[in-house]
């Protein structure tokens, strides 16, 4: 599997979890938040980095809609990525059988991406993630959530 095939596989799996494709990324939204998945191709090797960005509706008196600029921006109000345990799934410089890569990507979605984004689609969920130490909130974002 090469990186292009991987992106197609990522797209198929993301869609099974109700992520919509737009502007080279994927998103899921609620009335309170917008969750974005962005695969960023490295300039230093044959690998991707997964950026998970959450934008909170109403923060700084703004409404956030999926756009190329928003999907490709480096930072959301809340940011995450793939966990250390799954970093190798995105690295094509390290050999891995296609079937194993596919299964591990599915596992990453079920164990991390889906639970994290589902929780982060609400202000209360974001507060819970911060209380558990799963995310860090800048003081300005924390104040906006109060």
For each feature predicted by the language model, list its residue ranges:
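Intrinsically disordered, low-complexity regulatory regions enriched in serine/threonine/proline
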Residues: 1-9, 28-146
């Amino acid at each position: 599997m090469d990186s292009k095939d991987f992106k197609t596989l990522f797209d198929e799996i993301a869609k099974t979890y109700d992520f919509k494709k737009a502007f080279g990324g994927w998103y899921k939204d609620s009335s309170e938040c917008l969750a974005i998945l962005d695969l960023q191709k490295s300039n230093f090797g044959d690998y991707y980095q997964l950026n998970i960005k959450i934008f909170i509706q109403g923060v700084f008196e703004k409404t956030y809609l999926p756009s190329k600029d928003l999907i490709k921006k480096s930072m959301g109000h809340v940011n995450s990525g793939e966990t250390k345990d799954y970093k190798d799934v995105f690295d094509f410089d390290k050999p891995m059988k296609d079937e194993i890569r596919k299964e591990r990507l599915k596992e990453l979605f079920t164990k991390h991406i889906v639970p994290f984004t589902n929780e982060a689609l609400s202000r209360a969920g974001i507060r819970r993630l911060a209380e558990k130490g799963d995310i860090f909130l800048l003081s300005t974002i924390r104040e906006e959530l109060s």
